[in-house]
């Protein structure tokens, strides 16, 4: 059975969260997958954006809730 081609369009790059040793970036972008609605997307991307790792896509409503939940969160308070 042939692999289904996944289409994507990076509509806007918001920023890079981290870069790993192999040069892949964990990025926040606005991405349209398979001609669907553009969503905020957090995932790892190869240096040329040809290869893509697993990630998470969020609707506008989910992003609004996430912002609210993180508003008072201090990542430096968490014990490691």
List where the protein language model places each region:
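Positively charged, low-complexity terminal tracts
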Residues: 1-80
């Amino acid at each position: 059975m042939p692999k289904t081609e996944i289409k994507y369009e990076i509509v806007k790059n918001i920023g890079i969260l981290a870069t790993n040793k192999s040069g892949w970036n964990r990025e926040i972008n606005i991405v349209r997958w398979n001609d669907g609605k553009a969503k905020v997307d957090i995932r790892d991307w190869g240096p040329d954006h040809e290869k893509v790792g697993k990630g998470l896509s969020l609707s506008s409503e989910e992003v609004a809730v996430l912002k609210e939940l993180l508003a008072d969160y201090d990542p430096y308070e968490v014990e490691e």
